[in-house]
Amino acid sequence: MKHWRLVSYDIREPKRLRRVAKIMEGFGERIQYSVFRIYSTDKELEKLRWKLAKVTEEEDNIFYLTLCTKCASGAHTQEKKSAWPEAPKTLKIL
C-alpha cells in the first residue's frame, strides 16, 4: 500500500548534498530546498533509504515521516502547485 511521505535532509558536504538531491528527485517532488514529498510503498521507501545510505555519512541527517491519508489531506503550502493531491484511487482485484 502506498503512503505519502515527507523526507527532509541536512547534508554537510556540497558534493554529497547534490547526490542526495539527485536521488530524491527520482523518487518524489521537491517542496523546499531540502524537503521532498514522495508517494511510495514500504518497499520503495526501503529502496530509497538504501540508496541514500550509500552516499551519506554519519554526520548527515535524513528525516522520514509517513503521513496517514487524513494528515496528508491537511497539509498545505502557499503555492497552489505544491498542494498535496489526494492519493490516487487503488484498484482491488478480487
From Swiss-Prot:
It is an enzyme of class 3 (hydrolase). Pfam families: CRISPR_Cas2. Keywords: Antiviral defense, Endonuclease, Hydrolase, Magnesium, Metal-binding, Nuclease. Mg(2+) binds at residue 10. Its EC number is 3.1.-.-. Coiled coil: none annotated. One of its GO terms (molecular function) is metal ion binding. Its cofactor is Mg(2+). GO terms for biological process: defense response to virus; maintenance of CRISPR repeat elements. Belongs to the CRISPR-associated endoribonuclease Cas2 protein family. HAMAP family: Cas2. Homodimer, forms a heterotetramer with a Cas1 homodimer. CRISPR (clustered regularly interspaced short palindromic repeat), is an adaptive immune system that provides protection against mobile genetic elements (viruses, transposable elements and conjugative plasmids). CRISPR clusters contain sequences complementary to antecedent mobile elements and target invading nucleic acids. CRISPR clusters are transcribed and processed into CRISPR RNA (crRNA). Functions as a ssRNA-specific endoribonuclease. Involved in the integration of spacer DNA into the CRISPR cassette. This is CRISPR-associated endoribonuclease Cas2.
